[in-house]
Each structure stands twice: as structure tokens, then as C-alpha cells.
Amino acid sequence: MAEVDLCALFFNLRVKDVTSSDELKKHILSASDERNPLTEPGENQSMDVDEEGGTRDPGILYLYVDCPTMMQCFYGTSFPYNSRHGALLTNLPPYQKDVSLSEVSRGLRQASGFFGYEDPIRSAYFAALSFPGHVAKLDEQMELTSTNGESLTFDLYASDQLRLEPGAWVRHGECKFGMN
């Protein structure tokens, strides 16, 4: 199976030796900044977001899946349907220091109703997307408990389109939740 081979290769890759939450955050933000000069004024500047009050750009959104699914997305340029709404996206960054991977997996499972998030490894990889397509902001939010017991809330979005637009990928990799 090609996805398994790609996943094995992917697992051995380290993006600029990213080993901590802070390094991953800097890497994603710099990648996002690098993309801005590549677009013409008015082109891909914002995305359509369905919500009361009009359109706004939620910025970078994140998709959490396992490694083989990530490889299928990356090389097949398509989204997995991981919720009843289509592809479930969130503004929870993969470098959030004060949550554990198992808590993120629990939150995704609760938010999506998707049994695939039972095992934390099913959400160990991320795709950071500057989504030029249509996304809908969902009414529900993802509620997580931080490692120090505080309640954290993140917005949820969904896309029902199958294909990823060219240039939607900002970065992808292994999550660094709870790492200093």
C-alpha cells in the first residue's frame, strides 16, 4: 500500500528539525507569511465563511488525521470526510502547549462523532490550510481541558468540497501538543 510507504517516509522527515511547540508555531507562521506575497491583490485574500454577520477570514485552519490519511490527502489533493459535515477543521493549532494529544483526540471525537478519533494516533498529524474555498463555521465548538485544568474552547469549521484548491496547503506534519 503506497500510503503506508509514504507514511513511513513521512515519519522519518523532520521539518527544519522541529522538536517543540514553539518551533512548530514559528515554522507555520513563517510559512503562512511567505505565501502572502505570492498572491495577487484581491486573489485568495479571504475565504467564504457562512455565519451570521457576514464573511470573515478565520486565518489558518487545521485538519487532524492519522499519517496514512494525511498522505492520501497530500498526494491525492482531497479531503477526508471525518464528520457528518464533511471535513472537520478547527482553529486549534498543532503547537498548543497546554493540551495533550489524548485530550485533543477526545475533543475531536466528541465534536465530530467520528469513531476514528478513539485512538489518539488518529489525530497525531495535521494539515495547516489557508483555505481558499468555501468553509462553514459550525454552531458547536470544541471544548478541551488544559493540562492545568482550565477550560479551552476552539471554533469548528467544515468543508464539504472533495478537492483541495491549489495552494491551500501551508504545512503538514506531526503535532506537537503539550511540548515546551
Swiss-Prot record:
Keywords, sorted A to Z: Cytokinin biosynthesis, Glycosidase, Hydrolase
Molecular function in Gene Ontology: beta-glucosidase activity
InterPro entries: Glyco_hydro_41 (IPR006065), Glycosidase (IPR006064)
UniProt-listed Enzyme Commission number(s): 3.2.1.-
Gene Ontology biological process: carbohydrate metabolic process; cytokinin biosynthetic process
EC top class named in words: hydrolase
Region (Disordered) location: 31-54
UniProt KW Iron keyword: no
Coiled-coil features, chain-numbered ranges: none
Pfam families assigned to the protein according to its UniProt record, in alphabetical order: RolB_RolC
Free-text function comment from the UniProt entry: Hydrolyzes cytokinin glucosides thus liberating free cytokinins.
Protein name: Cytokinin-beta-glucosidase
Annotated organism of origin: Nicotiana glauca
